[in-house]
């Protein structure tokens, strides 16, 4: 946003960012279904913002099931530590991204060190998310690649 504002300011010096209304950005804590949110956060700052949102009264202290994975070059331990206060457990979601390696065993190690319950994401998990009958709130959190892969699978499971 800052870069776009700087470019717009060059083209029209009368532009004032303070006059910009509230933004609704796709993939930023976006509610997909009654029990499913997606956030394209991939760093500690994004994780802290999400933790703050899910700490609010509207969620009544309910903990999330985090659908997560991260690229190897990210500080996933800091991300997970920031999210720990609002998550019950983690489902490790695997996807392919050409030329980028996922954190793999190092994410498992970080989760163990942080004492966060976790396991691999399974097809039955997508059914649970889709059916929304188990009372859980799910948050798919990670890169644009994770969000895209997860949402494709989610919508395909719904026949969309």
Question: Where does each model-flagged region fall?
Answer:
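Short glycine-rich anion-binding loops that position phosphate/pyrophosphate groups of nucleotides
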Residues: 42-43, 72-73, 96-97, 144-146
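Short hydrophobic segments within beta-strands
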Residues: 67-69, 93, 141
């Amino acid at each position: 946003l800052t870069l776009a504002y700087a470019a717009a300011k060059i083209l029209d010096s009368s532009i004032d960012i303070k006059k910009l209304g509230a933004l609704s950005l796709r993939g930023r804590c976006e509610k997909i279904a009654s029990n499913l949110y997606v956030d394209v956060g991939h760093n500690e700052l994004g994780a802290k913002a999400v933790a703050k949102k899910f700490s609010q009264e509207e969620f009544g202290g309910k903990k999330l099931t985090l659908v997560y994975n991260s690229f190897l070059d990210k500080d996933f331990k800091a991300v997970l530590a920031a999210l720990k206060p609002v998550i019950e457990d983690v489902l490790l979601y695997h996807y392919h991204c050409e030329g980028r390696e996922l954190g793999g065993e190092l994410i498992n190690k970080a989760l163990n060190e942080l004492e966060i319950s976790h396991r691999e994401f399974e097809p039955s998990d997508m059914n649970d998310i889709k059916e929304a009958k188990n009372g859980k709130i799910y948050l798919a959190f990670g890169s644009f690649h994770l969000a895209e892969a997860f949402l494709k699978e989610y919508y395909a499971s719904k026949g969309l």
